A protein has these predicted regions:
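Active-site hotspot residues in diverse enzymes, especially metal/ion-binding acidic/histidine motifs
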Residues: 1-141
């Protein structure tokens, strides 16, 4: 399971700058310049600890995979980058085993899983979709 410490430890170990930036177009944005990465966090758009965890986990997926795109990129390229970041997030922090443990503990609804993992429902949905549709794994109650 993801902890904010995972994000900050990774960023420190890989020399990724984490910069608060008000007025960004999204709660979190990752950029690369000459091989160096920075994650910008707009705390005016991050209204809860759960959302902060989700944003940091997702942006970590962008940094770890290098899945970035230009602002002017076509929609298909943007979606490909987002998919890669979401896939990395599922493979590292919302694993098949994590879901099996959650289901075994009685957490089966999307909102319950979001509470269990302390992540936004959309992140849980993305990971469940990845495991069920891409890896053909089913989670039963």
């Amino acid at each position: 399971m993801f902890e904010l410490a995972n994000f900050y430890e990774y960023c420190q170990a890989h020399r990724v700058d984490v910069i608060p930036y008000l007025g960004a177009p999204h709660p979190g944005t990752t950029i690369r310049d000459a091989g160096a990465y920075a994650v910008f966090l707009d705390f005016s758009k991050i209204r809860s600890a759960r959302l902060l965890r989700g944003v940091c986990c997702h942006e970590l997926g962008h940094v770890a995979t290098g899945a970035l795109h230009k602002v002017s990129s076509p929609y298909e390229l943007v979606e490909r980058s987002e998919y890669r970041a979401n896939r990395w997030m599922a493979e590292h922090f919302l694993t098949e085993q994590d879901f099996r443990e959650a289901f075994a503990a009685g957490y089966t609804e999307l909102w319950q899983l979001a509470e269990y993992f302390e992540l936004p429902e959309q992140d849980i949905k993305n990971a469940l979709t990845y495991w069920s549709e891409r890896k053909n794994i089913t989670f039963s109650e």
